[in-house]
Amino acid sequence: MYFCQMFLRMIKKALLIVGMLTVTLSCSEYQKLLKSDDTAQKYTRAEELYNQGIEKDSDKSLKRSLRLLEQIEPQFRGKPQGQRLAYMVANAHYQLEDYYLAPFEFERFLQLYPNSDKAEEAEFKMAASYFYRSPKYNLDQTDTHKGIEKLQIYLNKYPDGEYSDKANEMATALQTKLEKKAFEIAKQYHKTQYYKAAIASFNNFLADNPGSPFREEAYFYRFDSAYLLAINSFQVLMEERLKEAKDFYETYKKYYPEGQYLPQMKDALEDINNRLQNF
């Protein structure tokens, strides 16, 4: 029994050593290949590593492939293999979630090979890169605007394309993020008691975003801003502002007759009506 255990340990150690030697040799061969001038061998190995990276979702293989691809791709432009190599460079960046280089490479691919059978995929992934780059709503939204623009270009070119459903979902999500930003800016004016600015911001928001999921809440905060502005106004301004707040209440009720904010709005409305009796 003891000798069996010893034998098994020796086998495990031997296998481990063989594995380590294989990895070392593999790394050494790869480094030699990087420094060599053998373009054909680089092409073959780059494609092997790329396919391995895609099939096994291996970042390591994709990164290795990319280093080789970037060395040889310029040499194949205008040749039959050029299109394949340019696509692999762009898609490797995309699969590695490098959403800053990926759209640049896909755009270059489309400029070089506009009639490629990979054109639709490249157009979508270029647009999707901006979607993944888009930050939280409270940060700068340049990439969000760019993403909407690029997704719309894709949808215009391929209205029934393979990725059209996903592109629509992404565009909607980005648009909602922009609406969230605009809504929160207006809401911040309300919170900090800049009621005039809040009313103006909510008016703009409602005019610009007719289908927004934040629309009901915007109507409520517009009313509440107008009400709070009115009751804190000088007497000479109060009547006009109370009437405006009442109009905002009626607008909310028209669009949301069973709205979630009606109970608290009715209390404010009663106060408005009582105050208006003094004029």
Q: Which residues does each predicted region cover?
A:
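Acidic, polar-rich low-complexity tracts and alpha-helical solenoid repeat scaffolds
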Residues: 2-7, 11, 26-279
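Bacterial N-terminal signal peptides
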Residues: 17-24
